[in-house]
């Protein structure tokens, strides 16, 4: 698919432009400098033609810390991916040394660049600096206002014109049901971004030893063995007590939860060195409550001493701490060494298939009647018959005499379905009860 990158220094409005072009709020927008830490991507569709758009991190001329340095390198490495570069500068405050520095890098990369002057609400004021913008060497600039939507259509038309001139195919919208959407979730620094990069076989997400370096939910469409997967690397979910109201971390938490809601399968990444914490239990609960298939991944096994002899220990730890998602397949990986990636993909596909599996009504009732015979329901409760009524997640409806079905007996029903009808590996089973009368 044709790919377009948005680049520029921090705080020139790249994320606002990205959100305007894709037609929804996906990149985090804030007036603090350097808010975007990850390259966020989505599809832009315009009159039946579409291309991939990537919002890159702001580039600093002289990075002040390890994160800024890695951000700069990450963005520079991505320049070769872009068929077109949208170079955004600030029309309100004019050019700075950072703009000239980035322009020099873009010229050296031989990229096809569209110079966009954002924040051009006041045309007369912006036009005073026209010669400065033109001197960057990218031809006549396009003056826009991402905030107000000014000249956005002209920008898209220019992008499409250049892409078509290159002979690139502008794909139609993919059939959504043909793609398995996978969210990588877990606590900060559990290794989600390293795993994300390992699956893609290249660096796409920012990876540093500092917890919480992923702020946006970033995604990538890949094809593995003929099947398309959309992998989403979410920001690590933090405890509410550690997140300030209206802070960037709060927006990241909301975005991560939204990514879970939009996914089919949630890959729950656990740091093997730290084990499963109370916060991990809460994160897994979010996925289960939303009816998502789950795969549990113990990461960093290359750092665990004598792991070969301790695998059962980790499985028992999982069963004890995450008993409510015990139906999930467990995969041991080293994201750093790319060990276990193949097994993970296989587990994801199996969990996805479980979401859509349907069982015969006759099988459900035969098993339930046997259960009632050998393990009768609590006094006063009668269960007459049932059937599977939905998928994604698998949902069963049982007709009763109206008495409440205790949670322990609901768990027994789920267990008997998994053991005697179909395992539904990775998928939660939802139960509904209705008074027959």
Curated annotation (Swiss-Prot):
Disulphide bonds annotated for this chain are none
Nucleotide-binding as a keyword of this entry, yes or no, is yes
In which residues is GTP 1 bound?
8-15, 55-59, 118-121
Could you say which protein family the record assigns here?
Answer: Belongs to the TRAFAC class TrmE-Era-EngA-EngB-Septin-like GTPase superfamily. EngA (Der) GTPase family.
Query: This chain belongs to which protein, by name?
Result: GTPase Der
What is this protein's function per UniProt? Answer: GTPase that plays an essential role in the late steps of ribosome biogenesis.
Residues reported in the UniProt entry to bind GTP 2: 186-193, 233-237, 299-302
Q: Which gene underlies this protein?
A: der
**Record-level Gene Ontology MF annotations:** GTP binding; ribosome binding
Keywords in alphabetical order: GTP-binding, Nucleotide-binding, Repeat, Ribosome biogenesis
Task: Write down the superkingdom of origin.
Answer: Bacteria
Under the heading PROSITE patterns, the entry gives: G_ENGA
One biological process term from GO is: ribosome biogenesis
Residue ranges of domain EngA-type G in the record: 2-167, 180-356
Q: Where is the KH-like domain?
A: 357-437
InterPro entries in the cross-refs:
G_ENGA, GTP-bd, GTPase_Der, KH_dom-like, KH_dom-like_a/b, P-loop_NTPase, Small_GTP-bd
Question: Assembly state and interactors?
Answer: Associates with the 50S ribosomal subunit.
Q: Which NCBIfam families match?
A: GTPase_EngA, small_GTP
């Amino acid at each position: 698919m044709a790919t377009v990158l948005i680049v520029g220094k921090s705080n020139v409005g790249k994320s606002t432009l990205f959100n305007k072009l894709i037609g929804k709020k996906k990149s985090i927008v804030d007036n603090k400098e350097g808010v975007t830490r990850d390259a966020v991507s989505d599809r832009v569709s315009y009159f039946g033609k579409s291309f991939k758009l990537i919002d890159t991190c702001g580039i600093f001329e002289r990075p002040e810390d390890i994160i800024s340095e890695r951000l700069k390198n990450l963005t520079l490495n991505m320049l070769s991916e872009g068929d077109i570069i949208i170079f955004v500068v600030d029309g309100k405050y004019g050019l700075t040394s950072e703009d000239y520095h980035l322009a020099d890098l873009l010229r050296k990369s031989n990229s096809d660049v569209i110079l966009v002057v954002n924040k051009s609400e006041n045309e007369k004021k912006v036009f005073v600096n026209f010669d400065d913008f033109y001197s960057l060497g990218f031809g006549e600039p396009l003056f826009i206002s991402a905030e107000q939507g000014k000249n956005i259509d002209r920008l898209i038309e220019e992008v499409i014109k250049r892409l078509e001139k290159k002979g690139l195919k502008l794909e139609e919208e993919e059939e959504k049901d043909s793609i398995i959407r996978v969210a990588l979730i877990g606590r900060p620094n559990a290794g989600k971004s390293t795993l994300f990069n390992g699956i893609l076989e290249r660096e796409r997400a920012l990876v540093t030893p500092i917890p919480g370096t992923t702020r946006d939910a970033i995604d990538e469409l890949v094809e593995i063995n003929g099947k398309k997967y959309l992998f989403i690397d979410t920001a690590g979910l933090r405890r509410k007590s550690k997140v300030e109201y209206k802070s960037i971390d709060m927006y990241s938490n909301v975005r991560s939860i939204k990514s879970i809601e939009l996914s089919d399968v949630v890959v729950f990444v656990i740091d093997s060195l730290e084990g499963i914490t109370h916060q991990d239990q809460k994160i897994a609960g979010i996925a289960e409550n939303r009816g998502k298939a789950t795969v549990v991944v113990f990461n960093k096994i290359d750092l665990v001493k004598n792991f070969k002899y301790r695998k059962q220990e980790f499985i028992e730890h999982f069963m004890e701490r995450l008993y409510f998602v015990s139906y999930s397949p467990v995969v041991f990986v080293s994201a750093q060494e790319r060990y276990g990636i193949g097994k993970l993909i296989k587990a994801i596909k199996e969990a996805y298939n479980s979401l859509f599996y349907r069982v015969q009504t006759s099988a459900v009732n035969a098993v339930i009647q046997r259960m009632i015979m050998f393990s009768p329901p609590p006094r006063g409760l009668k269960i007459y018959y049932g059937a599977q009524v939905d998928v994604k997640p698998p949902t069963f409806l049982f007709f009763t005499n109206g008495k409440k079905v205790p949670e322990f007996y609901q768990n027994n029903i789920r267990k008997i379905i998994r053991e005697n009808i179909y395992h539904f590996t990775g998928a939660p089973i939802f139960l509904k009860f209705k008074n027959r009368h």
